[in-house]
């Protein structure tokens, strides 16, 4: 992962291409049952919409888009640096038993 393309940066940081956001918007448009697991008209997709996807950083009261992009870029750079170190030093297999 020495280099990554502009497309990869865009996919990582562009909110309009964020799959979770698009999926959440799609689920919001559906007429679903109750998200309460104890309700007789419980719907798993409603639960997913109300409980899981609302925890997405761009859907709640979390980081701004600018801060989110900054954090995503920092995470990419950190990952890239770790890959460079592993590629230059090789992988450490000392924890694996040789007889296996």
UniProtKB/Swiss-Prot annotation:
The reaction(s) annotated as catalysed by this protein in its Swiss-Prot or TrEMBL entry are:
RNA(n) + a ribonucleoside 5'-triphosphate = RNA(n+1) + diphosphate
Q: What class of enzyme is it?
A: transferase
Keyword Nucleotidyltransferase in the entry? The reply is yes
Pfam families (UniProt xref): RNA_replicase_B
Domain of life of the native organism? Viruses
Enzyme Commission (EC) number: 2.7.7.48
What are the entry keywords? Nucleotidyltransferase, RNA-directed RNA polymerase, Transferase, Viral RNA replication
The alphabetized list of GO BP terms reads: viral RNA genome replication
Which terms does the record give in the GO molecular function aspect? Answer: RNA-directed RNA polymerase activity
> Its quaternary structure?
The polymerase complex is composed of four chains, the three other proteins of the complex (alpha, gamma, and delta chains) are supplied by the host cell.
Q: What does this protein do?
A: This enzyme is part of the viral RNA-dependent RNA polymerase complex.
Q: What is this protein called?
A: RNA-directed RNA polymerase beta chain
Question: From which source organism is this entry?
Answer: Enterobacteria phage JP34 (Bacteriophage JP34)
The top of its lineage is: Viruses, Riboviria, Orthornavirae, Lenarviricota, Leviviricetes
